[in-house]
From Swiss-Prot:
This is Large ribosomal subunit protein bL20. The keyword Oxidoreductase does not apply. Keywords: Ribonucleoprotein, Ribosomal protein, RNA-binding, rRNA-binding. It comes from the Bacteria. Belongs to the bacterial ribosomal protein bL20 family. InterPro entries: Ribosomal_bL20, RIBOSOMAL_L20_CS, Ribosomal_protein_bL20_C. One of its GO terms (biological process) is ribosomal large subunit assembly.
Length: 129
């Protein structure tokens, strides 16, 4: 059987792994085995956190909407309920952007939501107390 020399392939493989692990701390950026292990973990974290980022942004949008809504004397929950009742279809991302960049438009949306809400939410649906 012929002898297989893999020096160039192995060097190239190690070089690419070490290049990708540049910026890691300590041995993880200098030793091939440690760098390879860290790279596998890094890819796992990146995959996981790309999905987690979506939830984090939603939390941020809700916080911004709630802060702007409370400045207009309504809670986030009642605002969303009122917008749904009024048939206003605006997602949380755009609602947060409006709250930050255009407070007058957000105030108009709050007024629409307040108008669509019933007076007493806890009252039975057939009779108003």
């Amino acid at each position: 059987m012929a002898r297989v020399k893999r020096a160039l392939n192995a060097q190239k493989k190690r070089r690419t792994v070490l290049k990708a692990s540049k910026g890691y701390r300590g041995q993880r950026s200098r030793l091939y085995r440690k760098a390879k292990e860290q790279q596998l973990h890094s890819l796992t974290y990146a995959y996981r956190d790309r999905r987690a980022r979506k939830g984090e942004f939603r939390k941020l949008w809700i916080s911004r909407i709630n802060a702007a809504a409370r400045a207009n004397d309504i809670t986030y929950n009642r605002l969303i309920q009122g917008l749904k009742a009024a048939g206003v279809e605006v997602d949380r991302k755009n609602l947060a952007e409006i709250a930050v960049s255009d407070p007058a438009a957000f105030t108009a949306l709050v007024e629409v939501a307040k108008a669509a809400l019933p007076e007493d939410v806890n009252a039975p649906s057939g009779e108003a107390a």
